[in-house]
């Protein structure tokens, strides 16, 4: 074999290895499509990381609540953007991921709690490390759920949403990060500011972080799902120690360059 052929073989092998590594990174776990598991409840995806399948040790749980554009009865829609889509693109999240689909209307805190209990009953979930992350309609769902069951959630992040609860005092009992763009025309930033002002006015904002992204529109918040810092911040919390992590910052530059750090992701769905 001449030198030229050897070089060609090396190139082909390198490409094959890169392909295997890429596929492995994107499929390092198993997706379960769960329907009718909870009577009258949501259908959902349940992601199981590869290392859990080997060791069966306790793992954190991330609950992802989508926005209005993914509502319906086709579960594949839930993977168009968000946490599961980030995993598909290569994001490594050391946690189970529970991603329900809302058929329409507001998210129900009690139905979400039913899914949380299902996860704890069927998998070795670390109940001290349950996290909730949602955008738009899912941002409302996040605050409504964690405000109703604050003792069950270690930390939450609500993006460009609001809160429907009459009594929002539960939101002051867990680490919470609220983000909203000031140029949001779909859900005005006033919806998030109303929550922040309530917590401040009632002196229960010690576990609160909030950021108003100057000039940010509604869809730009979708980029947070593809940012490693989002998951680092969430998973740094535990219910055993109610203290908010303030050493991890997410800046405008982080958000603007998200798609440069990973592949194009799901820019087409920045309109929820």
Please describe what each predicted stretch is.
Residues 97, 181, 210-220:
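Histidine-bearing beta->alpha loop at or near hydrolase active sites
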Residues 172, 177-180, 184:
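Short beta-strand/loop motif that positions the catalytic acidic residue
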